[in-house]
Structure formats: structure tokens, C-alpha cells
Amino acid sequence: MEKVKLKEIFNNIYELKSDDGLKRIATKSLVPSKRIYGEKLITGEDNLEYRIWNPNRSKLGAAIVNGLKTMPIKKGSKVLYLGVSAGTTPSHVADITENSPVYSVEFAPRIMREFLDVSKDRKNLIPILGDATNPVEYSNVVEEVDVIFEDVAQPKQAEILVNNAKWFLKEGGYGMISIKARSVDVLRNPKEIFEEQKQILIEGGFEIVDEVNIEPFEKDHILFVGIWNKQ
């Protein structure tokens, strides 16, 4: 297999050198030879295996490709992930944090069953069947974390992040949230919704330090990154 030249752009996140001008990113495989969503596996010049991170299947991946400047998830980070779905993005987050826990909350039992297939090989993914709007449900499982990542398609997306931060996020920790405008209101201008959600985050205790629109990968979506200042 041809060895690929990689450049580390964030801790444990790599960009592939390509001739076509397209930005491609990858994470080092925590579980070699194991695909999660049909992603391509490559070998780096260090003879280690890497997984291509498809931005069409991951809002965090899309934000990185679109120029995210602040990426607080790194090796050793303790992460609370709200809305893990079938586990595409959490699997890459688990690659990044290596042995540190990724507390993985999902509300739908059917989807959680799919996620269990992902987590069985990645021991740092801790599956939690729970409701992100009610953090007390999993307060006996989740410890204080460095980062909360939220991808929950509900009207009160920003409030969910603030409430979970009050329970679990350390002082000076980071919140990352993918805002889906159409989940808040299908009729209003997405830009108005983004600004409204941003203000809720600020009033709740976050200092917004980065924001990235993730089109064309996801329509009417933005990703905010904020530093938590406990009230």
C-alpha cells in the first residue's frame, strides 16, 4: 500500500497532502483495520493506519475542513458528546482523545443499538442512553469534562449546552455546538437564528471564540466554540 504524507493540523488530527487541491483530513486509527462508516483507511509515512474523516458525514469534520481555528479536543481530553447518533464523529473523537473517556449520550434506543457496535471496539467510548435536556439522568456516570460537544436537533439547542455545562464542564473548559437552524424554526432566516442561539450561549456563560458555517456539507448549519466561565 502506498504511504501517504500527512501534516498534523491539530493535536491528533491530520491533513493529507493532495494534488487536486481538496482538503482531506484524517485521524490515527485507535482500532486498526476497523471501519465505522465505510471510510477509507490509509497508511502514513510512519507506517501507522489513519482513517479518512468524511466531512459529508460529520459536522465537526466539516467545520475543520471549512477552517475551524479553535479545536479543544485533543489527546487526554475528557469529552461529553451529546447526540452521538450512530457514532461517525464520536469514533474520530475517540481516535483523538486516545485513552481518555468520551461520554456518549443518545436518546433513541434504536440508534443507541447501532452505536454499541462502534463502542465495543473503542473502549474509551462510554455509551449512555439518556436525554440531553435532562442531564441529571446521567449525572451519576459523567465526571467533570474538558469539552462538551453537542449535535442535538432540538429547538432549544443552545440551552441544552448551557445546562450540561453547569453540570459537567470545568471552569475554562470548552463547549462546541452544531446549530441546525431548521430545528429551531423552519420559517425564520437562519442568520437570525444563529445570532439568537449565540446570544443564549453568551448569556449562559460562554465566551464565543470561534464560529464556522459548515455549508456546503450541511445546509443552514453553523458550529460555535466557546470557553466556559462558571456563573
Swiss-Prot record:
Family statement drawn from the similarity comment of this UniProt entry: Belongs to the methyltransferase superfamily. Fibrillarin family.
The protein's name in its UniProt record: Fibrillarin-like rRNA/tRNA 2'-O-methyltransferase
A Gene Ontology BP annotation from the UniProt entry: box C/D sno(s)RNA 3'-end processing
Positions of S-adenosyl-L-methionine binding: T88, T89, E106, F107, D131, A132, D151, V152, A153, Q154
Enzyme class at the top of the EC tree: transferase
Function according to Swiss-Prot or TrEMBL: Involved in pre-rRNA and tRNA processing. Utilizes the methyl donor S-adenosyl-L-methionine to catalyze the site-specific 2'-hydroxyl methylation of ribose moieties in rRNA and tRNA. Site specificity is provided by a guide RNA that base pairs with the substrate. Methylation occurs at a characteristic distance from the sequence involved in base pairing with the guide RNA.
Subunit structure, interactors included: Interacts with nop5. Component of box C/D small ribonucleoprotein (sRNP) particles that contain rpl7ae, FlpA and nop5, plus a guide RNA.
Listed Pfam families: Fibrillarin
MF terms (GO), sorted A to Z: histone H2AQ104 methyltransferase activity; RNA binding; rRNA methyltransferase activity
InterPro entries: Fibrillarin, Fibrillarin_CS, SAM-dependent_MTases_sf
Enzyme Commission number: 2.1.1.-
UniProtKB keywords: Methyltransferase, RNA-binding, rRNA processing, Transferase, tRNA processing
Gene3D superfamilies in the record: Phosphorylase Kinase, domain 1, Vaccinia Virus protein VP39
